[in-house]
From Swiss-Prot:
Coiled coil location: 32-86
Lineage: Eukaryota, Viridiplantae, Streptophyta, Embryophyta, Tracheophyta
Primary localization class, coarse: nucleus
Organism: Oryza sativa subsp. indica (Rice)
Protein name: Nucleosome assembly protein 1;2
Domain comment, as recorded: The acidic domain is probably involved in the interaction with histones.
Tissue specificity: Highly expressed in tissues exhibiting active cell-division activities, such as root and shoot meristems and young flowers.
Subunit structure: Binds preferentially histone H1 in vitro.
Residues of the propeptide: 362-364
PANTHER family cross-referenced by the UniProt entry: TESTIS-SPECIFIC Y-ENCODED PROTEIN
Residues anchoring lipid (S-farnesyl cysteine): 361
Gene encoding the protein: NAP1;2
Length: 364
């Protein structure tokens, strides 16, 4: 019965109340009263809808609402149990992730590798530890992430040692952590990206927060310096330098900023911001759900092949559905032709048969 306008939008509540503990008693009372009034207004509108129905129909709808309430209770229990199950298995994954970290970064050696390496590695070649460029190649093999990684980013991402994620509760959401070895690009050893969700069970993003990267002088990958020669005859003979923002994977740590509630933005700007936030969330959730749990499969390219195969199968299913639709249309056309013959003869040959229905078939 709802057209979507009756839903309670609390997306601005986090921005409006950054820290509820700092609110005075009066402010808290006003906030509670405001929410209560909003809910009462929604309830009144729903009551109006019910009262506009015929008594018998209204009774049926009331029973449907009771059924929906039972469903919502079960759904809440499902979300609760699912969260507990995810937390349980997340702890079971941790030892496996730790072993992966140690192998990738050369902390431990795999049985049998030492002797094989001594036999196969040329004496003049330096033996590499672990799996070089593991995370860089794992991410590059994913279609979404490969579009974000620029060629100039790759040297810095070779220092990426590990990626972890954690679920957070206050506020709800999740946090990504990128661990880097000492490198010539930035000072940070860990870069983080935190997603605050309005509802953890629904992917409704409130805002995202990234680490401020401490770039070393002249090493910032999110900006480029343009040098322009001065005009002829100019007294200033030095090149003119201009700094511009540029595409980089590391822009991921400077997410789109959601404006304050009292800041007005036009429709086009709002749509652009929404698209940017959706894209940003896609990148974060891809790293969380695909790259971290299946990193070696993305490193080898197996996971990418699996996704390509699934995409082909989906396309074939769509083609089959289209073929079925075409066959149904052909059958309908044949039936119409048969009906026309019964009424007064065959459809005239010529223009009417080239994918078009004849204008009219009159009886003689």
């Amino acid at each position: 019965m709802s057209d979507g306008k009756d839903s309670l939008d609390l997306s601005g509540l986090g921005a409006a109340v950054p820290n509820a503990k700092e609110l005075s008693a009066e402010d808290k009372a006003n906030l509670v009263e405001s929410i209560k009034n909003t809910l009462q207004g929604l309830a009144a509108r729903h009551t109006d809808v019910l009262e506009s129905l015929e008594p018998k129909v209204r009774k049926r709808v009331e029973v449907l609402r009771e059924i929906q309430s039972q469903h919502d209770d079960l759904e809440a229990k499902f979300f609760e149990e699912r969260a507990a199950l995810e937390a349980k298995y997340q702890k079971m994954y941790e030892p496996l992730y730790s072993k992966r970290y140690e192998i990738v970064n050369g902390v431990v050696e795999v049985d049998g590798v030492t002797k094989e390496a001594a036999d196969e590695t040329p004496a003049e070649q330096k033996e590499e530890k672990g799996v070089p460029e593991f995370w860089l190649n794992a991410m590059k093999n994913h279609e979404i992430l490969s579009e974000e990684i620029q060629e100039r980013d790759e040297e810095a991402l070779k220092y990426l040692k590990d990626i972890k994620w954690y679920r957070i509760s206050e506020p709800k959401g999740f946090k990504l952590e990128f661990y880097f070895d000492t490198n010539p690009f930035f000072k940070n050893s860990v870069l983080t990206k935190t997603y605050h969700m309005i509802d953890e069970d629904e992917p409704i993003l409130e805002k995202a927060i990234g680490t401020e990267i401490e770039w070393f002088p002249g090493k910032c990958l999110t900006q480029k310096v343009l040098k322009k020669k001065p005009k002829k005859g100019s007294k200033n003979t030095k090149p003119i330098t201009k700094t511009e923002n540029c595409e980089s994977f590391f822009n991921f740590f400077s997410p789109p900023q959601v404006p304050d509630d009292d800041e007005e933005i036009d429709e086009d700007t709002a749509e652009q911001l929404q698209n940017q936030m959706e894209q940003d969330y896609d990148i974060g959730s891809t790293i969380r759900d695909k790259i971290i749990p299946h990193a070696v499969s993305w490193f080898t390219g197996e996971a990418a092949q699996d996704e390509d195969f699934e995409g082909i199968m989906d396309d074939e299913d769509d083609d089959d559905e289209d073929d079925d639709d075409d066959e149904d249309e052909d059958d309908e056309d044949d039936d119409e032709d048969d009906e026309d013959e019964k009424k007064g003869g065959r459809v005239p040959s010529g223009e009417g048969q080239q994918g078009e229905r004849p204008a009219e078939c009159k009886q003689q």
